[in-house]
């Protein structure tokens, strides 16, 4: 698979990366050995870039996969939501131990929202120190927000940025409002021009765009400002689909079968705003005892109307 450098980091990654979140306990909850085999399969077929996070609880899948073969030049990115110095440094050390890696290639502040940069100065200092101490090779942030992505372009120490973008503009934020793919692409372009490594997330909008598989991938892979596209996988067949697409052998009419997909609402991200409930035509979304949204699968039509309106991307189709 074609590889590119992540900005000026000197780190070379496959143009498609493997997002490990879907196989973990937040979504599919695959047995570790089963998930590890999928990762190993992708590594064997040229994908060398893996994305995980402290929050995902997926380190065991990666650790097990790396023991299944002699894989060279594997690049691992992890992230943490910790805002303070000690919490972030502990997160880096936890990743090193859990992944059995002396150095974590990339470590990010996870899902930075508008107005949060000042709140995370302790975490930022920890990442700077971690790089100085040789614990990480590069550091930066991930965000769904245009203003944060734009700000990243002028952060001198920042090496990489991991923004959300897709052809439908789903989930792109700016302050407390939704934004557009055009605004996000402009922010990404500024990061790229500044020498920052850029790899993107949510090409399928959290699963909502999977039924437009090739259109979704055409959009992100056509952008020279994006060094790599992170795709979430939970099956070997999904890896094969991507390989077929990138290899140019996929039938132009092909779209994956999404008839068995289910809607899942991540309770740790949900804010109970009611947007998804209002959008559901089947009355399948209700509030639980904690005031958070859940899905009654006996009523759910899997129409996907709920996912695009969630301001924090807590609604996922898998």
Q: Locations of the language-model features?
A:
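Ferredoxin-like iron-sulfur electron-transfer modules
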Residues: 253-272, 283-302, 316-318
């Amino acid at each position: 698979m074609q590889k590119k450098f992540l900005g000026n980091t000197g780190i070379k990654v496959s143009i498609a990366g493997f997002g490990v979140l879907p196989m973990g306990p937040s979504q599919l909850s695959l047995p570790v050995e089963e998930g590890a085999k999928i990762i190993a399969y992708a590594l064997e077929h040229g994908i060398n870039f893996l994305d995980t996070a402290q929050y995902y609880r997926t380190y065991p899948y990666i650790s097990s996969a790396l023991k299944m073969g002699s894989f060279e030049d594997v690049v691992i990115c992890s992230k943490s939501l910790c805002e303070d110095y000690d919490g972030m440094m502990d997160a880096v050390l936890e990743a090193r131990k859990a992944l059995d890696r002396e150095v974590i290639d990339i470590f990010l502040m996870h899902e930075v929202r508008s107005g949060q940069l000042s709140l995370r100065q302790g975490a930022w200092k920890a990442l700077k120190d971690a790089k100085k101490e040789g614990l990480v090779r590069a550091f930066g942030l991930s965000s769904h927000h245009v203003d944060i992505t734009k700000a990243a372009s002028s952060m001198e120490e920042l090496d990489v940025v991991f923004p959300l973008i897709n052809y439908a503009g789903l989930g792109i934020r700016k302050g407390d409002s939704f934004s557009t793919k055009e605004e996000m692409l402009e922010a990404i372009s500024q990061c790229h021009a500044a020498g920052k490594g850029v790899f993107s997330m949510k090409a399928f909008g959290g699963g909502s765009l999977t039924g437009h598989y090739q259109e979704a991938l055409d959009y992100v892979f056509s952008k020279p400002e994006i060094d790599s596209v992170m795709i979430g996988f939970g099956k070997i067949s999904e890896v094969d689909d991507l390989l077929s697409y990138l290899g140019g052998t996929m039938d132009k009419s092909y779209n994956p079968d999404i008839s068995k997909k289910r809607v899942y609402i991540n309770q740790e991200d949900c804010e109970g705003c009611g947007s998804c409930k209002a959008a559901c035509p089947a009355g399948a979304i209700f509030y639980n005892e904690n005031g958070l949204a859940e899905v009654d699968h006996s009523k759910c039509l899997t129409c996907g109307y709920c996912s695009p309106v969630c301001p924090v991307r807590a609604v996922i189709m898998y």
